Amino acid sequence: MAGSPCLKLIEFAGEPIHVEFRSNLRARRGKLDERGAEVHAASFLHRRLIILDQELLRDKRDCERILAHEIFHFVWWKAPAVRKKYGSLIRQEFVAGTPGEMGWSADWRKQALHPNDVRNNSRRFRDYVCESFCDSCACLLLEISRHHEITLPPSARKTRRHFFEANLAGRRLKI
């Protein structure tokens, strides 16, 4: 998604977010749990903490992408108007049958959706929209246009880029 340098004008405002690296991250039911599924990262909004898997230190670009994704969870949490607008955009994509996503985190959630989830604005749909926002923001901010997890068609990427330029670029985003 090259061509979105104005997104780099984003300024984050808020208390510091602490970042830790740990080995063998696993999560279950929204908590880190050694019996859970492997994850790359976890965010704890109220504690202002992001935990990244140590393995990410082997791949600088993936580490940056996943850290940016996690930071945008804090933006999502503090931006109800953007949440509502982005949810409408994603609902339109879903109704149009737009395939793919900007990252694995959103993609597997999208594939698990049922039409009733979208119609009823279910928790499953809201979680998907959040992950889609964070994956998309991370790729736009870092100008990542090619990655094996990016499967969203170019036309939908362009629409999202315009959305982010209109709603986030040049703004001071609360985290």
Report the location of each language-model feature.
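Auxiliary, metal-adjacent structural segments of Zn-dependent hydrolase domains
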Residues: 1-60
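Catalytic Zn2+-binding segment of zinc metalloproteases
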Residues: 71-87
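Active-site alpha-helix of zinc metalloproteases
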Residues: 60-69, 74, 127, 131
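Metalloprotease/metallohydrolase-associated module, dominated by Zn2+-dependent proteases
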Residues: 4-6, 13, 34, 84-175
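A broadly tuned preference for mixed-charge, low-complexity surface segments
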Residues: 10, 41-42, 49, 66-73, ...
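Histidine (H) residue identity feature
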Residues: 18, 40, 46, 69, ...
